[in-house]
Amino acid sequence: MTDQNMKILTVDDFSTMRRIIRNMLRQLGYTNIVEAEDGAEALSLLQREKVDFVISDWNMPNMSGLDLLKAIRADEHLKPTPFLLVTAEALKENVVEAVKAGVNNYVVKPFTAETLKGKIDAIFKE
């Protein structure tokens, strides 16, 4: 069972997508949710606040989700942070690149709250 009180950071340049993910998380019982518009803003927030889990879009301006993942894995303090990458295409090359960068799991848009729950449960069973 995952900690319903864990702090979750959702990162997406599209505010509607952040709202959709936030609503899904609330539906699943998670209420401690913070948001960022891109990887650069997310990284800044991660360096200031303790976050237990990151859900990030892949394609964003300023800093992509993949670049955010690489920055997190390169930082000794942030390195252990579980990371779920959200992508529009499940291209094999992209998945391989994300796995090499240290992603815990990924989900392809569009997805349901049930799919999100399955991904979160799988990450926290690792």
Which positions does each model-derived feature cover?
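Two-component/phosphorelay signaling modules centered on CheY-like receiver
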Residues: S15-V34
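Alpha4 helix (beta4-alpha4-beta5 surface) of REC/receiver domains from two-component response regulators
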Residues: R22, D67, A90-N105
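Helix N-cap/capping motif at the beta->alpha junctions
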Residues: E35-S44, G65
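Short amphipathic alpha-helix used as the core "switch/output" element in two-component signaling
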Residues: S44, L66-K79
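Active-site beta3 strand of CheY-like receiver
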Residues: E49-I55
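Receiver (REC) domain active-site loop signature in two-component systems and cognate sites
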Residues: M60
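C-terminal output helix
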Residues: F111-I120
